[in-house]
């Protein structure tokens, strides 16, 4: 099953921001003590988040690790399909925070 994950924040009369990715439901690794099969999500949409809109000082260490890992995946999967200026942009856009 494919879903749209759309976390957002809207301030009435001022502005709004929303991040949107498509995700697919996949079987997950069993957890210790788990009695039933579990599922998790895998991100399908691979595009870097705009670094100009990220305040890294407001993110936890775990959030920074997730974002850097996501950007590494974007770079690893999209990078081989592009070259030249596009690759240079992608490498800059997905560099670790």
Put a short name on every predicted segment.
Residues 1-97:
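Charged, cofactor-coupling segments
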